[in-house]
Amino acid sequence: MEISQPSIGIFYISKVLALAPYATVRNSKGRVEIGRSWLFTVYSATLTVVMVFLTYRGLLFDANSEIPVRMKSATSKVVTALDVSVVVMAIVSGVYCGLFSLNDTLELNDRLNKIDNTLNAYNNFRRDRWRALGMAAVSLLAISILVGLDVGTWMRIAQDMNIAQSDTELNVHWYIPFYSLYFILTGLQVNIANTAYGLGRRFGRLNRMLSSSFLAENNATSAIKPQKVSTVKNVSVNRPAMPSALHASLTKLNGETLPSEAAAKNKGLLLKSLADSHESLGKCVHLLSNSFGIAVLFILVSCLLHLVATAYFLFLELLSKRDNGYLWVQMLWICFHFLRLLMVVEPCHLAARESRKTIQIVCEIERKVHEPILAEAVKKFWQQLLVVDADFSACGLCRVNRTILTSFASAIATYLVILIQFQRTNG
């Protein structure tokens, strides 16, 4: 996970949600040093175990009660159990990644600090900080409102189902630990999305630095070049020049139109620095995939199963009582789970797309640069880009990009048909 000046707010939110058991200290040079916090390590493990225990305790309470609120049929029991279990697995995997990925986190942030120093002229930490805080605030506010609406709806349904000597509202109370897990899950997704978005943002800034440093200047030089060549031709043809005058004209031409050897070397060093930064960003992508790959996998599975389960309960309600309040809440849950899926997929897709743009810019630079020193540096950068893979993956099982959305759409439709058929057969 990224722990930097722009994302420090998300880091503190993650600590409260048991996802970042680390401590940060600012050294004498002003840099943030990251280490393990044993207090928050114990806090993360304890909170996770307690919440998981209470969640399954509430699930069993509703399943074994005389009047179940959510588990009314055999199919609904299976769907609800899967719905709860996949959230639990996502939370456990996220906390596990936070507990055991300290080395990857240290390497990731060390690389990001060096990259930010290279791209210092294009950094805007203030805007990045507000974007990160805005993403976290909107996400947590949305899940708070949605959980409140859902609990209120189920409380109303439980009161309508209540009979003498039974307290169906207690069944809903036992689901509150499960709803609390959604806050941890949302914090985990905000953390991953912020890190992936930060990598994509740095890829984009590197591309802008490449374009402004090499393409803009070459375009200006090529626009001036014909005028200077024409001037030399007039001197040599219309008025016979003495050897000393001709030498002076050629010297002036070389000094004005061709970059000096020192300037070419400086540009070569700049290009090498940008190539190193691009390679380091690619390694940061792999570090994030390795450290949080299992969490991303369970998040994707949870999005898939939640979309299936929520749509299933929505169809059941449409075919039976048609409670308007319940229908609206289920539709809001579907929108939330879809946005939750996009929160993971879209930053990863944008980062990979910005990484692929770099090779297009380098190819354009290669066509316009003719100095031997620069041409060799551009060629090495181009060869490096041919083998760079900046795509995020979930434990190597699938690439996290927009193509996964079509697979999800077909899978949701298939599973919905199967569940509805089971419901009609078994009731």
Swiss-Prot record:
Q: Say if the entry is tagged with keyword Membrane.
A: yes
Effect caused by changing residue 421 to N: Low constitutive activity and loss of fructose sensitivity
InterPro entries in the record: 7TM_chemorcpt (IPR013604)
Q: What sections of the protein cross the membrane?
A: 38-63, 76-96, 136-158, 169-193, 294-316, 325-346, 403-423
**Record note on what altering residue 393 to W does:** Reduces conduit ion current amplitude significantly
Q: How does it assemble?
A: Homotetramer.
Q: What is this protein called?
A: Gustatory receptor for sugar taste 43a
Source species: Drosophila melanogaster (Fruit fly)
